Design a protein with these regions (language model features):
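Mature secreted bioactive peptide module from preproproteins
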Residues: 89-181
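N-terminal prepro-regions of secreted/extracellular proteins
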Residues: 1-97
Length: 181
């Protein structure tokens, strides 16, 4: 289901880019950003942020502010200076971290107080955390499900008390991975 939604979205935006002509020449998603009300400088800033995450984490850009992280989850990139990622896919891809956290998910945020770029985690797996400053997280998985925070060697150095739990001011500097179960 996840792969089908991402593939359908990619086809939709590819068709839109092909018809955008010179307008979309600067970025495959420039027309999508324009439709979302972004200025040219905001579009450029957002693309720079997406490019930085792609270089750091890999994956594939599937919308103006969405990165597919190897088929197991998505990253929703907030426009620099904005509290939450915008829905630029008209609901085609759901950010389970905003507004509120969907039941069953662990969400990691780049900023404190559950703001900024978000990584929703559903399937039991190890998820890369790209941030080094303080951010935040919410564990809204099945009651009692414990999330483990792993260092650069993949060793669990801390775990939460189980769902539901959260931290509005979490230090990411030592966390390289979260195993959400």
């Amino acid at each position: 289901m996840f792969a089908v939604a991402v593939a359908a979205l990619a086809l939709t935006f590819s068709a839109g880019v092909a018809s955008a002509g010179a307008e979309g020449a600067t970025s495959p998603y420039a027309s999508q950003a324009k439709q979302a009300g972004l200025t040219a400088s905001q579009t450029s800033a957002l693309q720079n942020e997406v490019d930085r995450y792609l270089a750091q984490m890999g994956g594939k850009q599937v919308a103006a502010n969405v990165i597919d992280l190897g088929g197991k989850n998505l990253m929703f990139v907030a426009l620099p200076g904005e509290a939450h990622p915008r829905d630029m896919t008209k609901g085609a891809l759901v950010d389970h971290c905003w507004p509120g956290v969907t039941d069953g998910y662990f969400c990691a945020y780049a900023g404190g107080n559950f703001t900024g770029t978000s990584i929703p985690m559903y399937n039991c797996a190890r998820y890369r955390i790209p941030w080094t400053a303080n951010g935040s997280w919410i564990n809204n998985q099945t009651i009692g499900t414990v999330a483990n925070f792993l260092d650069d060697s993949g060793v669990s150095r801390w775990h939460d008390g189980g769902a539901y739990s959260d931290d509005a001011d979490a230090p990411w500097y030592w966390v390289h991975w979260v195993k959400n179960c």
